[in-house]
Structure formats: structure tokens, C-alpha cells
A protein has these predicted regions:
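Class II aminoacyl-tRNA synthetase-like tRNA-binding/catalytic domains
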Residues: 2-119, 127-131
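Short acidic (Asp/Glu) and glycine-rich catalytic loops that position anionic groups and cofactors
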Residues: 5-11, 124-125, 260-262, 284
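Generic recognition of stable, solvent-exposed alpha-helical segments in well-folded globular domains
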Residues: 18-25, 29, 137-144, 148, ...
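Generic, well-ordered alpha-helical scaffold segments in large soluble proteins
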Residues: 29-37, 148, 152, 306
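Surface-exposed helix-capping loop/turn segments at secondary-structure junctions
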Residues: 36-43, 158-163, 306
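A general structural signal for short secondary-structure junctions and capping/turn motifs
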Residues: 68-70, 92-98, 118-120, 169, ...
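Extended, charged alpha-beta segments that form solvent-exposed binding/catalytic grooves
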Residues: 99, 104-196
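A translation/RNA-centric and nucleic-acid-associated enzymatic feature enriched
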Residues: 109, 179-309
Length: 309
């Protein structure tokens, strides 16, 4: 059952017509700014992939994919849940070099999503991926990319306020980002659930990048589920903002430096997913045939929620 609510006494800053205009403006401005900032080029994205390739996102490993068979060839296809793995292969196939990347307008169906104000069966994302050097696989590099994305959000917001004066009563976000690991967050709030920890910290500190998601913490449990075959769990995170109308933190982007052959090898075993080693994508990563990359997804709908109040 959906848990979507409209907060008491909530009044939108824009009427319905201007809201639609503003949504289009946000999508255009942010995509252009993100591409300029990270040196990305738009490519077309698939709506579905062959199940046998291992390219679909398994999310937490329990969500059912929308699957269908194709009459021509008897191929089993799956509607994408994200393009996390597809993008890395595409960078190789398209011949992208170090320092350049791609982004897609990704549309997905997640049939097992729990519905609320922030989650839908239909998922839209700017899915992006960029080729990096092996020596760029560091926390410092990851943090610099996070700061670049937040700066793109702030630049979009300032332009939006200039175009829609009705939004000028909303407070502007700053480019400042607080970085904290999931273990540090658990140590700070040991008696709270992971989501309660996020809410408490982001309400106090504002824009936050929560790092190192996927591996078990000292408590024996991971902060949140994360697939073992695209993000390096030591070099990933969620970009969190405070949502004032909903009075909660929420994730604008999940992103990270992608697995090396060594980290995929370790994480597949940790997650009990060694059977995936036989899939074409996983073979390619383990053999070192795919480029080192960083990437993530950014939700246009969530960005509009953030900037339109």
C-alpha cells in the first residue's frame, strides 16, 4: 500500500502550469551543467537488456525484475532497474577515453519498490559514467566529483530562482558538503536505525555524502544493501539533502568508483554471489577488460522536489 502523503499546511510555491515549466527548466539546466562539469556526452539508453548478459542491476538481490520472452530468437529480456553495469560496458564499446564520460536518460521499472513520497515503481534517472585512471580510485577523487555535482545543483537552483521569482522565498542550498562514513554514523547514533541516523545527521548538518555503503559494519549489518558488482563498497556513497516539507533526509544520488577486478572478486564472495562470475559482464571486469570508471544515478524527480520546494 502506498505511503504517499501531502504534509499538513503544505502550499506549493508554483501553480501547476508553472510547475511543469520549472520541471522542464530544471531538467535542461542541470543536464547541461552536469555535462559541462564532468565532461559527459549524452547517449541513448536501453529500456531492456538480455537476462543472460548480467548487465541488469540486481539492486539488493531480492527485487524481482520485469521479465519477458521475445518471440524472435526466444531471448529472455529484462526491463532495466538501472544502467550501472551497462554504462561501463558502453564506455568501452564506444571508445571513451580517460576523462570523458556519458550520461543517459534512464527509465526503469522496479516492481517491488515500497511506494511513498520518494519511491515509485517507475524510476527516472540521469545515469552517468566516466572513465578514470587506476590512480584516481581514491576517496579524494570521489569527494571532488561529489562537490562538483553539488555545485551543479546550486548553479541550477540560482538560475531557477532568477527565472521564477516565486521561488525566491525558498532558501538557497550552499555548495558545502559534509562527508561521513556509515561506520562513523553508526558510532554516533548506535541506538537508531540506519534511516533514523541519516535523518538525525542531515537535519543537523545539511548536505551530506554518506560513504562506504554495502559491507557489514561493527554491528554485523550493512548500513544499506548495495549490489556487489558495480560500486566498490570502500569508494561509494549516497548524496543526501534535507527535505523540509517532508522533514526527512533523502537521497538525490547514489554513486561511486566502480569495482576493480580485485574488489569485485572480494565483494562477490562476501555477498554470496559467486555464481555471477560466469556472466559475461562479470568475466570482463574480473579479467580487467573494462575501463576503470566512476558513475552514479541522479533522480530528476527528486531534484525537482528539492529545488521547487
Amino acid at each position: 500500500m502506498s505511503k504517499t502523503i501531502i504534509p499538513a499546511n503544505y502550499t506549493p510555491a508554483l501553480n501547476l502550469y508553472d510547475t511543469q515549466r520549472a520541471i522542464g527548466t530544471v531538467k535542461r539546466l542541470f543536464a547541461d551543467t552536469l555535462c559541462a562539469t564532468l565532461n559527459l556526452y549524452r547517449v541513448s539508453a536501453p529500456l531492456f537488456v538480455e537476462a543472460s548478459t548480467g548487465l541488469n542491476d540486481d539492486l539488493n538481490g531480492v527485487e524481482r525484475k520485469v521479465t519477458f520472452d521475445m518471440k524472435d530468437g526466444g531471448i529472455e529480456a529484462q526491463v532495466v532497474q538501472s544502467l550501472a553495469k551497462w554504462k561501463r560496458k558502453a564506455l568501452k564499446d564506444y571508445g571513451f577515453r580517460v576523462g570523458k564520460g556519458l550520461y543517459c536518460d534512464m527509465n526503469a521499472i522496479r516492481r517491488d519498490e515500497d511506494l511513498d513520497n520518494l519511491h515509485s515503481v517507475y524510476v527516472d534517472q540521469w545515469d552517468w559514467e566516466k572513465v578514470i585512471r587506476e590512480e584516481d580510485r581514491t576517496e579524494a577523487y570521489l569527494k571532488n566529483v561529489v562537490r562538483s555535482i553539488v555545485s551543479a545543483v546550486c548553479a541550477t537552483e540560482m538560475n531557477l530562482h532568477a527565472m521564477f521569482p516565486q521561488l525566491q522565498d525558498l532558501p538557497l542550498h550552499t555548495p558545502n558538503v559534509t562527508f561521513i562514513t556509515t561506520q562513523e554514523l553508526e558510532d554516533k547514533y548506535p541506538d537508531l536505525t540506519p534511516k533514523e541516523r541519516e535523518n538525525a545527521f542531515v537535519k543537523e548538518n545539511g548536505t551530506t555524502f554518506l560513504m562506504k555503503i554495502g559491507a557489514p559494519l561493527k554491528s554485523g549489518k550493512p548500513h544499506d544493501g548495495r549490489a556487489p558488482d558495480y560500486d566498490d563498497w570502500d569508494l561509494n556513497g549516497d548524496l543526501l539533502f534535507w527535505n523540509e516539507p517532508l522533514q526527512c533526509s533523502y537521497e538525490l544520488s547514489s554513486m561511486g568508483i566502480r569495482v576493480s577486478p580485485e574488489s569485485m572478486d572480494k565483494q562477490l564472495t562476501m555477498a554470496g554471489c559467486d555464481d555471477r562470475r560466469a556472466l559475461p559482464f562479470h568475466k570482463a571486469v574480473l579479467a580487467g577488460e573494462l575501463p576503470y570508471t566512476i558513475g552514479g544515478g541522479i533522480g530528476p524527480s527528486r531534484l525537482c522536489m528539492l529545488l521547487l520546494g
